[in-house]
């Protein structure tokens, strides 16, 4: 059997023409098609590689913008044909305060326009047009990747799309199985007295020393005891001035009077922070199950969220937010997610359908995992589909809203 005949057999199996095939044996190109396999040294059980040479003319690439615009227009028309009438959506929002609140959180621009029918229609169509354009661009990009899958740059993009699909699936699983991880955790405070002055102390086992602000030290009348020889600069996430150290002062925790040392530091919004030095010295135990600080067999309950003074929470409420490309907002200090990610944009990283390449080119299907059967009531799914949405969109929205029908409709709108 000659190399040329081998290429013909490959063509019959893969529809790849012989002139686009490059046969490799031991990473060596078989350039002479007239030689037999025996002459080349190929025996039974040997493995051969076929490298496909694809011709990618520049004209289709330049026309990508036009085709993307046409696809976007088709997507928009399909959305408008399948989706509910804008006036129906507007009346549904106005008729249910819970739906309007959900829309206000997820889509403030659309919520603000709900009182004006013409403005609402314009905003809704503009948002649908943007989504259709993004979807068309992604589909066009997927088509280009499918056209030349062996290109190293394309391989990296394919890997990134697969990674993004995994991230999206992980997000959906987290929101479905443990949505509490997206909330904000109340910090641990206990009521104490320092030198007869009552205040709330922040319990932080991650701090090396017990820290007090200069204002609190003045209020407790211990600023006069600050040893400035222990001053300096604290470096961590930023810097802060250390004014000095109070070597010993009395602190009351529960009914216990304990000696404690304080490092007086500027730049802290918290009056008193109980660090690891004080906690270990008195063998304190943070018991989260009981919600208390156990110290010398005495339980001191942590303050509830409603009992924590407002000024102690300002640092966390006014914390800088890190915005992601998909709309998520994460607290820079606490890590709390205060605005859920745009699931539609994240999940569209891997479109479920892409334009098919020519039959003589290998195809790489980049798809998210198929949607599983929903665990939510069929009545809820039916009510959403009656508004013009597909069953898959209804199930995804119910998963994101943890089964809440109004919240799911708010996500879709």
From Swiss-Prot:
Which top class of enzyme applies to this chain?
A: hydrolase
Q: Which GO terms describe its biological process?
A: protein transport; proteolysis
Instruction: Identify which residues the record assigns to the active site.
Output: 204
EC number(s) for this protein?
3.4.23.-
Residues in coiled coil: none
Pfam families from the xrefs?
Asp_protease (PF09668), Ddi2_HDD (PF24669), UBA (PF00627), ubiquitin (PF00240)
Show where the UBA domain sits: 375-413
Question: Which GO cellular component terms are attached?
Answer: cytoplasm
User: What is a single molecular function from GO for this protein?
Assistant: aspartic-type endopeptidase activity
Localisation per UniProt entry: Cytoplasm
Biased composition annotated in UniProt, kind: Low complexity: 61-81, 340-362
Q: Which family does it belong to?
A: Belongs to the DDI1 family.
What's the protein called, per UniProt? DNA damage-inducible protein 1
Q: Which organism is it from?
A: Aspergillus terreus (strain NIH 2624 / FGSC A1156)
Its organism's taxonomic lineage begins at: Eukaryota, Fungi, Dikarya, Ascomycota, Pezizomycotina
């Amino acid at each position: 059997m000659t190399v040329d005949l081998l290429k013909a057999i490959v063509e019959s199996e893969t529809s790849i023409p012989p002139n686009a095939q490059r046969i490799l044996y031991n990473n060596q190109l078989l350039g002479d098609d007239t030689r037999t396999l025996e002459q080349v040294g190929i025996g039974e059980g040997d493995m051969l590689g076929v490298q496909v040479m694809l011709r990618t003319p520049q004209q289709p690439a330049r026309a990508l913008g036009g085709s993307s615009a046409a696809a976007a227009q088709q997507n928009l028309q399909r959305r408008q044909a399948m989706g509910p009438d804008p006036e129906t959506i507007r009346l549904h929002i106005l008729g249910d305060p819970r739906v309007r609140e959900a829309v206000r959180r997820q889509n403030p621009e659309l919520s603000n326009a709900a009182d004006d029918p013409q403005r609402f229609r314009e905003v809704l169509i503009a948002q649908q047009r943007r989504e259709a354009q993004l979807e068309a661009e992604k589909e066009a990009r997927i088509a280009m990747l499918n056209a030349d899958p062996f290109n190293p740059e394309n391989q990296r993009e394919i890997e990134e799309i697969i990674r993004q699909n995994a991230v999206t699936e992980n997000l959906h699983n987290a929101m479905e199985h443990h949505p509490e991880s997206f909330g904000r955790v109340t910090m641990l405070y206990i009521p104490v007295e320092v030198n007869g002055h009552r205040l709330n102390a922040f319990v932080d086992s991650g701090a090396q020393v017990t820290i007090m602000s200069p204002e609190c030290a003045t209020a407790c009348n211990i600023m006069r005891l600050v040893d400035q020889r222990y001053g300096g600069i604290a470096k961590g996430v930023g810097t802060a001035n250390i004014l000095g150290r109070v070597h010993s002062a009395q602190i009351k925790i529960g009914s216990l009077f304990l000696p404690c040392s304080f490092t007086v530091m500027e730049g802290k919004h918290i009056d008193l922070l109980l660090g690891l030095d004080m906690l270990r010295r008195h063998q304190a135990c943070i018991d989260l199950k009981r919600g208390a600080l156990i110290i010398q067999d005495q339980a001191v309950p942590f303050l509830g969220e409603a009992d924590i003074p407002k000024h102690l929470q300002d640092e966390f409420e006014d914390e800088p937010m890190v915005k992601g490309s998909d709309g998520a907002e994460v607290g820079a200090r606490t890590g709390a997610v205060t605005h859920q990610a745009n699931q539609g944009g994240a999940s569209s990283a891997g479109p479920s359908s892409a334009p098919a390449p020519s039959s003589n080119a290998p195809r790489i299907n980049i798809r998210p995992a198929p949607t599983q059967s929903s665990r939510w009531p069929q009545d809820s799914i039916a009510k959403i589909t009656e508004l013009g949405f597909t069953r898959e969109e209804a199930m995804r929205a119910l998963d994101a809203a943890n089964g809440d029908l109004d919240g799911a409709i708010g996500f879709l709108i």
